[in-house]
Amino acid sequence: MVISADTSFLFSLYGNDSKTPDALKWSAGNDDSVWITALTHFELVNALRFAECRSFIGVGLSDQFAVDFRTDLKEGRLIEPSCDLGEILAEASRLSAAHTLTGAHRGFDILHVAAARIMRATHFLTFDANQKKLAENAGLIVPI
């Protein structure tokens, strides 16, 4: 089983929002590493900074949360393999052509699902209802 996650799940896990209890509960019951991409890594760290800039989280917390995230990467709870961006973009283009006109999917959401498929993920973690539909249509199991 390969589990991949999008930024909404990771922000809830490492940041602090209304879904944080759900992310922590899922994480406590899971022993498998979660696979992410450099795109997800970038988007999460930027989202943490954005949240601090907008005062959604306290001053200095974006750095603290990013350290927690990077610690989990270093300790293997998260895995960030090298991925071929060309492969991800090709799969994202395919998913967009197949689903965006009927599902109104955003670009980065499509990239995360495409990357999960390229990494041969079986499961996908997201708190974004629209992205959940895309992931399920792409054959991924979305357990939360």
Where are these regions (language model features)?
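Active-site neighborhoods of divalent-metal-dependent phosphate/nucleic-acid chemistry enzymes
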Residues: R77-A129
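Acidic/polar active-site rim loop that often engages polyanionic ligands
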Residues: A47-F50, R70-K74
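Short, well-structured N-terminal submotif of metal-dependent ribonuclease cores
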Residues: M1-F42, N46, A51-Q64, A138-I141
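Short loop/helix-cap segments at secondary-structure boundaries that form the rim of catalytic
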Residues: Q131-A138
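Hydrophobic side chains within alpha-helical segments
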Residues: F9, N46, H112-A115, Q131
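Histidine- and aromatic-rich ligand-binding microenvironments
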Residues: A5-D6, H105-G107, D128, L140-I144
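A short secondary-structure junction motif
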Residues: D17, D72, L95-H99
